[in-house]
């Protein structure tokens, strides 16, 4: 009888715990979508994991960026438990999303949280170059973003800037030494990307930069030494 009572109490405690967790799960994501910062903060203080994913695999921070829910973004970024590098199903990190949207202040905050500037596949620099976010591109490069990073199909930031970004974005990448000769899996260079969308001025700019590099005098060592 005693064992039966103990087992019953144990099952009740477990059931109550699961119910509480389910309630917190729903409350958290409802608060995130509604930009209810106080509710999110309260849940975190009670031990809710900010890195929990919803039924679609999205974290609270990713959802807050999408909505957007700016107050909740601040709460989550300020939480030491938040992993700012967790990506969505498309392998997009919070830094990538902030970069393509031109959210400079958020990019700065994420970098202060040690958000990864470089990663396998598409990178924040690809995204910033795509939308011509010059200031963010400079910040990423200053934080050692790999300028010739390749996406899964071999596309570089210069290629994305050539097709979708601004001429200033292309100019910046060229000035910083982006490789003009690289090709993606289809054998296309940055010039090909520009020509594909009839951006002849951009194609000419890249071609001129490549020619200038090819004709640049080679460094000569002094007295036989570098």
Summary of predicted features, one role per range:
Residues 21-28, 113, 143, 176, ...:
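Ankyrin-repeat-protein effector appendages
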Residues 54, 88, 118-121, 151, ...:
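Ankyrin repeat boundary/linker residues
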Residues 50, 84, 114-117, 147, ...:
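Ankyrin-repeat inter-repeat connecting loop/turn
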Residues 30-35, 63-69, 97-103, 127-133, ...:
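Ankyrin repeat A-helix N-terminal signature
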Residues 2-5, 20-48, 55-58, 211-226:
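Intrinsically disordered, low-complexity regulatory segments in ankyrin-centric signaling systems
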Residues 9-17:
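Bacterial N-terminal signal peptides
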Residues 36-44, 69-78, 103-111, 133-141, ...:
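Ankyrin repeat structural motif
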């Amino acid at each position: 009888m005693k064992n039966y009572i103990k087992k019953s109490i144990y099952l009740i405690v477990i059931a109550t715990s699961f119910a509480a967790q389910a309630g917190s799960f729903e409350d958290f994501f409802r608060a995130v979508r509604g930009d209810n910062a106080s509710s999110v903060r309260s849940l975190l203080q009670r031990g809710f994991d900010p890195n929990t994913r919803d039924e679609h695999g999205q974290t609270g921070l990713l959802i807050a960026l999408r909505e957007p829910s700016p107050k909740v973004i601040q709460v989550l970024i300020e939480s030491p438990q938040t992993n700012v590098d967790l990506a969505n199903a498309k392998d997009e990190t919070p830094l990538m999303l902030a970069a393509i949207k031109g959210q400079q202040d958020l990019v700065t905050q994420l970098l202060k949280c040690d958000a990864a500037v470089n990663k396998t596949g598409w990178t924040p620099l690809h995204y910033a170059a795509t939308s011509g976010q010059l200031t963010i591109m400079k910040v990423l490069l200053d934080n050692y973003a790999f300028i010739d990073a390749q996406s899964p199909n071999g596309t570089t930031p210069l290629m994305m800037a050539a097709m979708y970004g601004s001429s200033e974005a292309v100019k910046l990448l060229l000035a910083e030494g982006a490789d003009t000769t690289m090709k993606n899996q289809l054998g296309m260079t940055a010039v090909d990307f520009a020509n594909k969308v009839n951006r002849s001025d951009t194609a000419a700019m890249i071609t001129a930069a490549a020619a200038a590099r090819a004709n640049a005098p080679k460094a000569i060592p002094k007295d036989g030494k570098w």
